[in-house]
Structures are given as structure tokens and as C-alpha cells.
Amino acid sequence: MVEKLSRHILVASDGSPNAKRVLAYISELFARRSDFEVTIVSIAPPVPSHLRQVNPALHEVKRWKLVEEIEAKHFQLAQDIVIRAKEFLVSHGFPPSRVHTKALVQRADVARDILFEARMGKYDAVAVGRRGLSRMAASFMGSVSYKLIQSQSEVPVWLIDGQVVNSRYLLAVDLCEDCLKVIDHVGFILAGDSEAEIVLYHVIPSFRPFMAKEEEFFLGEIEELVLKKEEERARAFFQEASKILAEGNFSENQIRVKIKTGSTNVAADIINEAQRGNYGTVALGRRGQGGFKEMILGSTSTKVIFGLMDRAIWVVA
């Protein structure tokens, strides 16, 4: 039975306030779950490249001694970070046996090292602070977070931000086959959680904003018919989605379907629904219906990720 399988999340931490929000989110939602494990990883930065090269101004013995001292210091800092993070999770309800730690030395860049560990460890998701790891922070969003969601990895990425933590989950999906991966992921992670409230949300856009004035007279006449067929297709899709979620032993009143028609801005409608409904977590796919593989992050997903603050966003490949 799916509910008996263990869920294992890789939490990337650098000891920053953003990283602590990730720990708070994980502990609030999953500490009481006996089928949930966490591995905390911290990436120790490498020795500066100029010290890796022969330097005529620096004696070789002294150079290597300095390299070893810096490596040891960086690794110890990474170890201290994961130890403190584990102490936080344990103090907030996680049994020590379900919290593991790893301190790793940076080999490529931080995002690639995290994804490599995620693939090798076969984790169910990677959780990271929305604004990224402090050492790699960027002006718009932490570059580590951005690289993680832009990667072609199949590992879902959880971007954690803000203080809104509750058991309300908004699954923003269109009718593409890849969207079933979003439902599968959420259903697997939350299976058996009697407190979870799940809303399957689909937005059907209006044709009118894209019509020229002289075309609206003709195409506007069929818009109602097209939207009706789209709505019927959406309801059939969500009936199938509900069957998938039903395998997680959710009760009928835990899962609802919400369809919005006539939208002029799909991303804005998803953001508004998340805020108005006070959802603590929004789950969506990297690419939407008709998305090209070359476009790793779809337009709607990008707008939601950048526009929705103070929530957790699960980005599923």
C-alpha cells in the first residue's frame, strides 16, 4: 500500500534564516508522520582557486597547509550547520532516527551538487529556501533556487518562503499529461494525512483578449461553446485525478475541484486563489500544456513562482 512507503526529503541548508523557514515548514507538516524521513545536506565551499595553484610568493608547504586548514574549516562549518538543523527538527517533534545529516564538499556549483545528491539518494523531493542559499544569493531569487527549478532533473523542488504554514494544498494544473505527475507527487507525499485539504484548480482562459475587434463578432459566438467543451474536458480530467488521490486513502471531503472560466490572466488567477484561499502550499508543473522541452520552466509557472510570496511552492517535473 502506498501509505506505508517512506517519504524521504533532501533539505538543503546553509544555516540562514531562509533555511530555518524550510525546517519550520517541514517540522510543522511532517514531524508527526511515522513514514517521513529527512536528510539535511550542507555544501562546504571549496578552497579559493588561487590557492590551488602554485604561487611563487608562497612556499609550497605553507600553501598546502593553508589549503588543508581552509578545507577543514569549511567542512566543519557545513557539519555544524547540519547538526544544528537536526537539533531543530528533533526539538520540533522529529524522532532522531528519522533525521539524517550530510556535509559535502562543493564539486561543481551548489545547485548541481544538490541535484546530484538528490538523484543518487533517490529522494522524493529537494526542499530549499525560496531566496536561495545565502552564499549564492542573487537579486531576484537565490541563484541556487533558480537553478534547481530550471534544471531538467526529474526530482521535484520545494521552494519554501514565509510564515504561512498549514495543511491546505492548491494543485494548479492544466489538462496536460505531465500534470498527472503533480497529482502523483502530492498524493504520494500526503497519503494517509487526514488533515490535508486538497483543491484541484484549473483555469480556462478566455479567447477575447486575443481577438481583433472585427474577429470578435465571429469567434465570440463560439467562445461559449468552446469553453463549455473545455470545462467538460477539465471535469473528466479531475475525475481521473481524484481517483489517483483516492489511492492515498483521502476521504471525499478532503479533495475538491475548482474550475475558473473566462480568465484573462491564468497566473494571476492562481496567485489570487492561493492568497484568497490561504493555501500554505501551491503545487504546479515546470511546464504546462504544449510546453516545449527546451523551455524548462513554463510561462505560467514562472509568473506564479515569481509573483506568489509567503508560501511554499512545489515544482514538479
Language-model region placement:
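Gly/Ser-rich helix-loop-strand patches that form or flank binding pockets
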Residues: 4-5, 25, 31-32, 112-165, ...
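A structural micro-motif
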Residues: 36, 97, 155, 196, ...
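Small/aliphatic-rich secondary-structure junction motif
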Residues: 2-68, 165-224, 243-256
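Residue-level recognition of beta-strand->loop/alpha-helix junctions
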Residues: 42, 103-105, 202, 259, ...
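Short, structured motif recognition centered on aromatic/hydrophobic residues
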Residues: 11, 38-40, 89, 123-126, ...
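A short acidic, glycine-rich active-site loop
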Residues: 63-80, 220-236
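Structural beta-alpha unit
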Residues: 1-5, 72, 76, 83-126, ...
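Fold-core signature of tandem repeat domains
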Residues: 81-82, 114, 183, 237-238
